[in-house]
């Protein structure tokens, strides 16, 4: 199996100002194509350190990928560091330079001298076109190894890497299936279904538990045992039932969208503690306007009363964080938007605002459907962002289950 090393470059990564999502993406994609990931590293914009780690990576792996450091500023040193590490020249590509100058003039009225820095290509390197940003990538061979230079912004890196991925195929390509679940603890899942999970020694089983996304079970093996992996997955699925919310690359909101489209249903949201996160997550899906009527972010009690029609007496008697309140919020949203389904969420995301009866993490959710209303109260853990994200996942899950019941 060929080995790969990923080097994420940038002071902003080392200092924790930006989260490195590129390495996660690259590692996952490379693993699917049969690469063993030796390591991922985060390096500062320091020429000597970069050269040292690049040379070590060349010794240890067949494929080295760098992300970041291809911009026009003085601290963008990846081109220089790679060229120095392998003893090759940097050559100015006149066509790229002119294109960068023309683009700068078009958008900014002038072209700073620094913009041309991005036109320098390592000797004998293939240019990887950047259709989103300005910094082109590079791919080259050295001493039987492949070195790839990619820009840092994920919106640029991902399509550029996908465009060259076929060139990196190995004879060790892997096949992976994923089952995504909610409502069943990782330990319970692995214990109760271990006979199915470990029925084939050629399949590697891995689980990933996330408070924000549930439990994912990953099945991986050589491409030639694809049918065997599918058999294990298909054997397990009926056992897990509605706990399975998605397979492979799909997310919870994707599944909800597909169910709504399939049944010609529409939905609306009334959000309090999630602050629009449910709606924002949903509209990430292209074409969602066909099923999404709208939403109300009613954070204050006044907004809940005046916009959604929650009775003042309900809030005074039960509180804004109560099933009684979210039921009326859901009914109000359904009426306002004339949707088939509506979902309402109200909770205490923290860090303050909790009490002995309703501690931080108390979240109430209601789903209004053609069949009636379903509501529940959850006691969630974590910080403010985790509680909001978990509430969003649970809200979509309650909606998913509600749609399934309505369709028979």
Swiss-Prot record:
Phylogenetic classification of the source organism: Bacteria, Thermotogati, Thermotogota, Thermotogae, Thermotogales
Organism whose genome encodes this protein: Fervidobacterium nodosum (strain ATCC 35602 / DSM 5306 / Rt17-B1)
Highest taxon listed in the record's lineage: Bacteria
SUPFAM superfamilies assigned to the protein according to its UniProt record, in alphabetical order: CinA-like, Molybdenum cofactor biosynthesis proteins
One of the Pfam families matching this protein, by short name: MoCF_biosynth
Entry's family note: Belongs to the CinA family.
Coiled-coil ranges per UniProt: none
Identification of the protein by name: CinA-like protein
């Amino acid at each position: 199996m060929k080995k790969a090393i990923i080097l994420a470059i940038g002071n902003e990564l080392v200092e924790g100002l930006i989260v490195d999502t590129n390495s996660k993406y690259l590692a996952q994609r490379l693993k699917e194509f049969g690469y063993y990931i030796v390591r991922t590293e985060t390096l500062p914009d320091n020429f000597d350190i970069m050269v040292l780690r690049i040379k070590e990576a060349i010794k240890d792996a067949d494929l080295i990928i760098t992300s970041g450091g291809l911009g026009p500023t003085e601290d963008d040193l990846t081109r220089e560091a790679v060229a120095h590490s392998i003893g090759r020249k940097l050559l100015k590509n006149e066509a790229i330079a002119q294109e960068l100058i023309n683009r700068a003039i078009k958008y900014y009225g002038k072209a700073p001298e620094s913009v041309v820095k991005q036109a320098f290509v390592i000797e004998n390197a293939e240019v990887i076109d950047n259709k989103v940003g300005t910094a082109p990538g590079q791919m080259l061979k050295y001493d039987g190894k492949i070195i790839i230079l990619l820009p840092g912004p994920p919106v640029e890196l991902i399509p550029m890497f996908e465009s060259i991925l076929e060139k990196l195929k190995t004879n060790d390509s892997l096949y992976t299936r994923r089952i995504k679940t909610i409502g069943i603890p990782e330990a319970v899942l692995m214990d109760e279904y271990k006979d199915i999970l470990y029925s084939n020694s050629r399949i590697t089983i891995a689980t990933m538990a996330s408070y924000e996304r549930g439990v994912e079970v990953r099945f991986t093996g050589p491409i030639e045992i694809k049918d065997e992996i599918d058999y294990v997955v298909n054997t397990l699925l009926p056992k897990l039932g509605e706990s399975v919310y998605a397979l492979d690359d799909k997310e919870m909101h994707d599944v909800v969208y597909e169910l709504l489209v399939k049944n010609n249903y529409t939905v609306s949201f009334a959000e309090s503690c999630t602050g629009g996160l449910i709606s924002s997550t949903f509209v990430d899906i292209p074409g969602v306007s066909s099923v999404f009527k709208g939403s109300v972010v009613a954070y204050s009690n006044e907004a809940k009363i005046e916009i959604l029609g929650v009775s003042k007496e309900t809030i005074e008697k039960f509180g804004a964080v109560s099933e009684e309140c979210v039921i009326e919020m859901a009914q109000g949203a359904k009426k306002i938007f004339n949707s088939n389904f509506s979902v309402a969420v109200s909770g205490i995301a923290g860090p303050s605002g909790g009490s002995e009866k309703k501690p931080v993490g108390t979240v109430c959710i209601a789903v209004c459907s053609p069949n009636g209303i379903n509501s529940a109260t959850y006691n969630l853990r974590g910080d403010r962002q985790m509680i909001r994200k978990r509430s969003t996942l649970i809200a979509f899950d309650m909606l998913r289950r509600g749609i399934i019941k309505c369709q028979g």
